[in-house]
Amino acid sequence: MSTDIFSICAKCLGDESRIKMIKQVNGDECRQCTRPYTIYRWGNRKQGNKTIICITCARARHCCQSCLLDITYGIPTDLRDTALEMAGLEPLTKSANPTNREVKAIMADKLETKFKEQQERSNDILSKLAEKLNKPEEKKTEVAIDVAKLAKKLPFGNSLDVQKYPDMTTFFVFGFSSDFPQAIFSRYAEQYGKVESVVFSSVSGCGFIRFEKVSSAVGFAKSIAENGLNKNKSIAGLLILENTPMRVCFGKQKPLPRTAADQRKLNTVVTKVMKQLASKSKVGVVVKTKPNVYKALSEDYEE
């Protein structure tokens, strides 16, 4: 199959010698650039797979169109770029967040060229990183425990109180659906100032956004807190974009799960917390409970 048509990793394609693919021209909007793109679907009905970003964005990020992992090494692109940055190389996907679709396409082409130029220098670093990350898991129980601990460390209990977090520029965003385009959230945030980074996990249903300036973060926080949907100011603020509800609060950035299984487990926690916050928001007053404590974050979060 020609790489001129799509960019899909071997793991997503599976072990079948023959794969039947369904092609749908302009079937959806790319989650990265929001331009219409050709969707490819394959697999059976129970475990069907599909591409979720366009070929231009996939080539620019050097990632799989389905799982969004690095197409060569099978590692998360944000982790890959961090490793390259620490080694003195320019991250492959670190760029501004333009709103114009044509500009995004041009920038995607430039990112693809940049990757080719520094590919030889980065191969050694990424090979070693991939070797460590892709080792078979020895104890699945240990992974589950780590996910539970991570869920407890995520700032679900924080708010949008700018006086409580005067110098913070990072926000925790959670509760959005798996098909919600990151680009829509980025466009909304960019109204309040330059965004330094956006890290979303579609499967987990949560992520982080960081502004360059405190003034931008303050404007962003107030816009959500005062949008008429948030009577209870002591909890994460409710934001609705494109009919998709989500919660936003101040919070330090934490690493999110890398495997699909762990991401689904974290999504279970996110769903439970969203329901609990919905009941609290109806009260409209400060609820007398311990901060940052939710039933969904208990050890039996997998239920």
Swiss-Prot record:
Keyword Hydrolase assigned: no
Family matches, as Pfam families: STL11_N
Quaternary structure and partners: Associated with the spliceosome.
Role according to the record: Involved in pre-mRNA splicing. Facilitates the cooperative formation of U2/U6 helix II in association with stem II in the spliceosome. Binds to RNA.
GO BP terms, alphabetized: mRNA processing; RNA splicing
One of the record's GO molecular function terms: pre-mRNA binding
CC terms in the record's Gene Ontology section: Prp19 complex; U2-type catalytic step 1 spliceosome; U2-type catalytic step 2 spliceosome
InterPro entries the record matches: Cwc2/Slt11, Nucleotide-bd_a/b_plait_sf, RBD_domain_sf, Slt11_RRM, STL11/RBM22-like_N
The protein's name in its UniProt record: Pre-mRNA-splicing factor SLT11
Keyword set, alphabetical order: mRNA processing, mRNA splicing, Nucleus, RNA-binding, Spliceosome
Protein's cellular compartments: Nucleus
PANTHER family linked: PRE-MRNA-SPLICING FACTOR RBM22
Stated family: Belongs to the SLT11 family.
